[in-house]
Amino acid sequence: MTPEYKAIKNILDANKHIADVSQARQLLAQLLPYSAHWDDCRDIIAGNIYGQLIWSIATGYEVLGDYENAVQIANDGILKIEEDSDYNPKVKSAIYEILGRCYSQLGDKEKAVSAIEKMPYYDPFQLNTHWPNESFYSFRSVSEYSLQDLRNNTVSLSSVSTFNDPVDSSFFPWIDKQLREKSTDDARKIYLEAMKEAFGKYRARCFVATRPLPLNWEEAKAPRESFENVPPYFNTLMWAHYSNYHKGFCVEYNIPSDVAGVDVRTKRVVAMRPINYVDNMPYKQELSFEEAFLTKSKRWEYEHEVRMIYFKQGDNSANPVVSLGNDYEKSIRAVYIGMRCHKEHEAEILDIMRAHPSIPVYRMKVSNDDIYSLERELIAGNIRETVSSIAPKKKQCWFCRCLKKVVKAIGCK
């Protein structure tokens, strides 16, 4: 580690946030004399602070309004950072964001979009989570896409903007409001339009868990409140909201661990992440990725949603498909057919599942004990119980229990 490296690191440590023009001038005055030694900071063994260095210098120029120098520094730096590693997602996303803002200030919308389109690839990098024994449920209407997914062991995705709740993703109402308010600021408008175009390319699929899953390591370690472990397919609201009023079906998945992850060769990222539920979402100047795409109103908290987020650079497909692998029986644990599913649709589902006789297929019906509850009956395949697929025990009142005992004692049927 050279003396110059140490000096640069000390300067960066003292200037992690550039608040104003005065600080920007001071930072550049300190760092520019070391320009011959900037590449020394690319040394991974020494600590690899090169990304922080490039971000700081480019931000300094941006704060001063010197957008051309900011672009030059950021472009030269990001080429080296990409060359050094396929990772460092936070640094790369931050530098591409600077490029997007500065190109917008220079009036170059095409280059602004090109830079900002790199951000959606890096933002979900560190969000991947996996629960090897957890069941995830997908409620579907019967359609070409849903039957194709069931047949091919795939998951088709769609834009979050097409979900049933118009504020399901905070990003779209947030950016539309920003565009309305910044309509007279040409540079800001270019930047926001580029953001909307780039981040509008995210695709997603919603799954439902049997319990609220931890959002981070701290939550995973903390003691959690007890809850009734009732599988989602017993929830009449889920069928009504997401399965065409009980006319569709529900698939119980065990998502393989290698599905979620990053493919650096094709620049594709698939992330699995629980939704965070909040009381409100005030408008503010900036949104984090989690706030924009992985946060919903507490009114939806009963769903225990886990969202699959997909992005691939250069892929503009409306409904891309993610494969769950070749082991069908490992990926799909069970299929549940809605109580109002048309007979011809049920026949199509059963025809697909004949190729996988070990997987149970159930038909849902109104419970014999409670009109407001659902039951399942096995109509194909073999029963393969998991912790999450055991039907909840029906609680009966004291009088009913006594009456049953009396009926049994006198031999009535």
Q: Can you name each region flagged by the protein language model?
A:
Residues A29-L32, N75, L79-E82, E117:
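Alpha-solenoid helical repeat scaffolds
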Residues M1-A7, N15, C41-I49:
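TPR-adjacent "capping" and linker segments in tetratricopeptide-repeat scaffold/adaptor proteins
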Residues N10, I49, S56, V91-A94, ...:
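"A position-specific structural signal for the A-helix of alpha-solenoid helical repeats
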Residues Y34-G47, L79-K90:
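Flexible helix-coil transition and linker loops at the boundaries of alpha-helical arrays
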Residues S56, V63, Y87, Y96-K413:
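Partner-binding and oligomerization surfaces adjacent to conserved cores of proteins
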Residues L12-A19, E62, S104:
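Specific register positions within alpha-helical solenoid repeats of the TPR/Sel1-like families, i.e.
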